[in-house]
Curated annotation (Swiss-Prot):
Record field: compositional bias (Basic and acidic residues): 19-63, 152-166
Region entry Disordered, spans: 17-63, 129-166
Tissue: Expressed exclusively in testis.
InterPro entries recorded: XLR/SYCP3, XLR/SYCP3/FAM9_dom
Compartments where located: Nucleus
Designated name of the protein: Protein FAM9C
Domain of life assignment: Eukaryota
Keywords: Nucleus
A GO biological-process term: spermatid development
Pfam families: Cor1
Gene Ontology cellular component terms for the protein in this record: synaptonemal complex
Keyword Translocase annotated: no
Length: 166
């Protein structure tokens, strides 16, 4: 955990250096403690426990094994996120394809319906026109019948007046 804290401090210091316009890498070498010769048995960590020289960074005293573990955890976490993102992207594309298919199907149904209606429309219009013509003819026949009836009434009235005189 101490190595993680130390790593965070180093990262924050590097970010501050970048903001200040300094090169964090070259500045890092300036801040390091001078290297002293040590033997494998002389290396101890912060808690006084001895570790092998190969597992410890000679400049900072950070346990490289711990850093490698942290890096491995980060890689696992990123791989898991990448898989989740890929799954989400795949699901989105599937949903997008479904929506396209539904829209295409709906559009085809609408076009078929409109086509069938357009085929029926001339027949319906023709029926309407013939019905209107029949109604007009029927109106003309009714008018003729009314005229004939009125003429007959006049004759009857005239006949009735003429018979009364007799």
């Amino acid at each position: 955990m101490a190595a993680k804290d130390q790593l965070e401090v180093q990262v924050m210091a590097a970010q501050e250096m970048e903001l200040a316009g300094k090169d964090p890498v070259s500045h890092e070498h300036e801040e390091r403690k001078p290297v002293t010769e040590t033997k494998e048995g002389d290396v101890t960590d912060e808690h006084g426990e001895r570790g092998s020289f190969a597992e410890t960074d000679e400049h900072t005293g950070v346990d490289t094994k711990e850093l490698e573990d942290i890096a491995a955890d980060i890689k696992e976490h990123l791989a898991a996120k990448r898989k989740r993102i890929e799954k989400i992207a795949k699901a989105c594309s599937e949903i997008k394809n479904r929506i396209k298919n539904v829209l295409r199907t709906t559009q085809l149904k609408r076009q078929k319906r409109d086509y069938r209606i357009s085929l029926k429309l001339p027949n319906v219009l023709e029926e309407f026109i013939t019905d209107e013509q029949k109604d007009e003819e029927g109106d003309g026949e009714k008018e003729e019948q009314i005229k004939i009836f009125q003429e007959q009434q006049k004759r009857w009235q005239q006949d009735g007046k003429g018979t009364e005189r007799d």
